[in-house]
Amino acid sequence: MYKEINKSGLLNSAILILTLISTNEIIAANEPVYKSIYNVNHGALIYSHNHGQNQYLWADYAHNLSGDWKANANWNLMYNSDGTIYFVNQNSGLCLQHYGTNYQIVEHKCTGSHEKQKFNFELISSGAILIKFAHNSECIYMSSGIRYYSIYSDVCDQTNKDFYWAIVPPLAP
């Protein structure tokens, strides 16, 4: 009988441990997981000016983003039930959004269901990813300016490294 009680105790302990682990994962899944969006060709990160809705997004080198600006380059990757993702900026709380073909990308109030805020990733042979709008399959790309980089959308071009991205650890504020 002692062996039966001992086995039952082990089983109950195992169930308790598994319950605690799975509960911890659920709690952790509700925490924001910030990342930065890094252009492989230029080595710059997409950031928000944090000036409100319908403002253009830009990119700069990590060493140029200091103090509170570091969090402007951090994005929470949120998953939609349809398999797409959307990006929420850590400081502004706004989402990356398509504005128009050959126009700069803007940030706007997040809805989670706005078609122009939904993205898919496409892994390419170099190991980089293309970040594609789900509603029209256009990709975001980085264009170099004189003092900073601009972020645009256009037809995807796998041969143009301006379209190559990586999701990297966030900048620490």
What are these regions (language model features)?
Residues 2-13:
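Bacterial N-terminal signal peptides that target proteins for export
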Residues 12-21:
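Bacterial N-terminal signal peptides
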